[in-house]
């Protein structure tokens, strides 16, 4: 008798995706982050669902409803801290996942890569709107500053901002629509994730060597299911350590003060995972220029396949490109640090230099290194 997982219409899809999927035998731990992101998404949806049961999207009660969740709801505090720190873990896994794809040349799978960029934008939008919901000082002012950036768009900017706000300032209408969108977007992310997987399984996974793995493939289960579970354990450990011992380590103390439109915090800054883009935004003195640089800092990922000049796909045997890649990673850490600092000397000049080097490494130096390495191979 044929196994039910190979004949049943529904189980057959699961079987081809997670059990009998032919996978390259040499993929490393860097390929674990896809499954970790899936687990983060499931956890965010579950914790978010329980938080939404007790949260009220109203300017007068939003802050106190979050306090009520932490104080009065059974295990409300752990649900809330798992959700906030879960977002941080989500972005850590997301950035490592993108970094791995850049290092090993996975962006050559165009459909998968483009869906991935759409996923990144959607996750960023969801996280931003989630940060507004507790209605603390940083929530309110973060929402005001970031949405106000759209006013830099010529002609329609001001109208667009007021349309998003639902009035002439960030108020009840803004909070209600942000809550609605924050609730619905994770389900859109889930649909996009399924599309991402669908396109990935059309081509098969990449591998560290960047060559065709067709000659040596193994079934996904049990080999990679075990490997993914092994990767899941440290992630759960870090997450629980954050939620139980250092729940506010990655947050902002200003968000424990209720939102006050009459009192501006000394330093308005977003969550740590947006600081690199925020630093690029601030490094340009012109408003429209800053907004364009902010969008391009992430949208630049879409043109990576066009900038690939090397004959080899992976950076594994390309020392010059490797050096540039790690310079880019260090540069991103510098930008993240600068994004959290006040706008004063020497931070402004460091931010401007880091922003210039960020774009030059990706747009000029990496393609040049690829061409140099092509010529070196002829020697």
Curated annotation (Swiss-Prot):
The chain crosses the membrane at residues 33-53, 77-98, 113-133, 178-198, 226-246, 288-308, 320-340, 347-367. SUPFAM superfamilies: a domain/subunit of cytochrome bc1 complex (Ubiquinol-cytochrome c reductase), Transmembrane di-heme cytochromes. Its cofactor is heme b. Keywords: Electron transport, Heme, Iron, Membrane, Metal-binding, Mitochondrion, Mitochondrion inner membrane, Respiratory chain, Transmembrane, Transmembrane helix, Transport, Ubiquinone. It is a multi-pass membrane protein. Heme 1 (or BL or b562) is low-potential and absorbs at about 562 nm, and heme 2 (or BH or b566) is high-potential and absorbs at about 566 nm. PANTHER family: CYTOCHROME B. This is Cytochrome b. It comes from Choloepus didactylus.
